[in-house]
Amino acid sequence: MVTLSQHAYAEYDLAEVGSVVRLPAALDGKPFPGEPLGCAMNILARAGIETGQTVAIVGIGFLGALLTRLATDAGARVIAIARRPFALGIARAMGAAETVAMDDHWRIIEAVTALTDGRLCARVIEATGKQWPLDLAAELTAERGRLVIAGYHQDGPRQVNMQQWNWRGLDVINAHERDPARYVQGMRAAVAAVAEGRLDPAPLYTHSYPLARLDEALAATRDRPEGFMKAFVVP
């Protein structure tokens, strides 16, 4: 089972029945981080991606990689933008049509402009939680396009170019859900997608740690060593 609760890293937990989603037999013994997988499904729904659209995903961590696969399967042409070469390789494996190294602000804009014949992107998903990639994501969004904020911004206020957002007529979507029922809905959608083979997150689980080495797992999540995408902790 997967559940919403506030007791991470515990061997046992107690949760409301409405916050628990039963896993099918096909997922027995397989890691299934319900909250982030459900989060990806909810972001996809909020993004409103349509077949034939060009979608830029800024930041290819676990969430960005999942969204690359989901957006590709929705019929979009995905341009993945990430700092690490390893992450760009993951994005290609998850279906990205194009990859761009996240190194220089103006070079990235020029690259995406060229890849889209000057039209930029109908949908841009920012999945880093940092100021510069948020600025970059806005630059890559086409007129009347949709800027989807999926990154978790937690290190202080953000400044945005409101004149640019206004001039381009952007729809700006905060894709974070706070209603527990929406969380559970996303987790149910994720369970179905993985069980039916429409989404395979297994290649993204690059590291595993026992609970006794939780400190190492958290350090890896912070430092992102070469080859790291997602760690799971087992009792």
Predicted regions located by residue number:
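C-terminal hydrophobic helical "lid"/dimerization subdomain
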Residues: 135-138, 186-235
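Glycine-rich cofactor phosphate-binding loops and adjacent beta1-alpha1 units
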Residues: 97-171
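C-terminal substrate-binding/catalytic core of Rossmann-like NAD(P)-dependent dehydrogenases/reductases
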Residues: 110-113, 156-205, 216
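Glycine/charged-rich beta-loop-alpha catalytic/anionic-binding loops adjacent to active sites
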Residues: 19-29, 53, 119, 171
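Hydrophobic beta-strand signal
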Residues: 1-3, 56, 148
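Short, glycine/polar-rich helix-capping loops at beta-to-alpha or helix-loop-helix junctions
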Residues: 8-11, 83-90, 156-162
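Mid-domain Rossmann-like dinucleotide-binding core that forms the NAD(H)/NADP(H) cofactor-binding site
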Residues: 30-104
